[in-house]
């Protein structure tokens, strides 16, 4: 079994500002900090560097409470992501927050509109659609593993883990191949605007640039598809209605941004984290090779372990008590999903990477009404890429340091250099 540094709680930083510092998320040990908070104050009042306070929720029970009661905890009033600075907390300056407060994107809607919008989009992510898509995903996975083996050495993040989900979502959306690199670059910038490798100027400027670029692209493409709709996801956006009213251009563009950006994060980062842990824990790799049935439970442990979406922001719509604390209407609450997924009261040996973990009620895909629309697709991709990996890869090892993305929203990877060896082929 593999254990990480978060299992040892020592020398903890005292400054709660670390909770939203993108560079601490990249290089620090947040799991140690969260473990202490779960013990001492799982509902804890915290100040941002720009003076706005919020309730920090770190226990599984409290995070799940937020998901199970979308009426009391609004995703729309102030958006669903904790702003990094005062500018990003100002809807006059932040395009993403302004659109969020309009309910332009699916995850930033409250009932009943959230359910209506979700039903308008979900066809491409239902079991029947995924069954039809599976041969494409399987062939893609085999090709990516084959290309990796042909190189011998590669950057697993950008050569495999990022290409798998981006190619799949671009296929579902029927994005022209010549535009993939542009959209991938803008998605990285929008998801991690504070990372110097992705950002371009200030955090606010980088985020606004990315959103504007992808929105404009999706809106223009949707106008073309509306005239002659097909079976692709852009055509769905172009022709969808909510309560009989067509989506606005902003709603089409912002949901397109969601599919392009968020559609990549879970698989890319869970897969990289999972492979990294299998390298560090050869007993788990041997266990998987001896029992391929573990491919059914492995995807959820990959997601639990990394928790690609670290948190969601909610706004209290009424006065209430939560975890012994008095919450007032209008208060912000930040539910730390990554902390909930290591809660010692829910998961046996939570700091142990266990590909056969059962049960595994992690919240990495959200829960209830806000269960990730692409959750089943992410599981399919992880299962298929690992099937191809087991079939074709004999050995994999790190050849350098793993580099993490500087983001307080997504627990991501930038680079993971590896060396791989192909399995010997037996010729009858």
Give residue ranges: language-model regions.
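Cytochrome P450
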Residues: 1-428
